[in-house]
Amino acid sequence: MRRLIKSCLNRKLVIDVLIICSFCLISLIYFKPVLSGKKIKQSDIDQFSGMSRQIVEHRENFDEEPYWLDNAFLGMPTYQVAVSYPFDVLDKVDKIIRFLPRPADYLFVYLLSFFLLLKSMKVRSDYAFFGSIAFAFSTYLIIILGVGHNTKALAIGYAPLALAGFFKILNNRTLSGVVICSVGLGLQINANHYQMTYYFMMLMGLILIMSTLFEKGDNLKSKFVKTGAFSSSVLILSLIHISEPTRHSA
């Protein structure tokens, strides 16, 4: 019996790994020109390059990060433009996940993140595969890549990963849930598109409220307090992930 269970688990794991590998292939086939060194023309990225030029020049001339920019909307903090954080751990995790050439890497994040969400909901691998395809190739998610809304694409792409961990917490799989959700939410916040993060936090709040409505009596209070506590822990861990010590830190 144990051998049978182990065999089934190994078979499912192999299938899931093959599906994830197929996501790499699908992403590269869809954006085939990147294989010949071509780059997609993104209007927002052209504007970003001009806006961030002052930051690049300051970095090259003074070997330090400027934290204020004069030529963007009459002045604004550079953390919303192109500041570099040398000790950003999640940035390194993001680069590992997005190992494909741009913009195929964004499509891969869409596919992988939504696949992990569906698997956390115990959806069959074949259904999860087609569900991921439907999500990743939805019209809007492709359009925003064309115009260069890269941070928005990344914030949307990592949201299902955070949601996968959140569902695990709701289903009392707290340890794995906290780890996955904190990393996913950290990556989502680290994408630096706070509008999408704001919408996503609203979604998580609604899911938490709706999930407690199905509980009764003492279970209602217990689940709400427990889930709320773990969710708060996730948020704190996510913020710790993206916090960046500098020489100006207290």
PLM region spans:
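Start-transfer (signal-anchor) and selected internal transmembrane alpha helices
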Residues: 1-30, 218, 223-234
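Membrane-interface coil-to-helix junctions
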Residues: 27-117, 133-160
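Transmembrane-helix signature of polytopic, membrane-embedded enzymes
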Residues: 118-137, 172-178
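Specific aromatic-rich, kink-prone transmembrane helix
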Residues: 155-171, 183, 203-210
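Short hydrophobic alpha-helices at membrane interfaces in multi-pass membrane enzymes
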Residues: 168-186, 220-229
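Perimembrane helix-loop-helix junctions
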Residues: 198-237
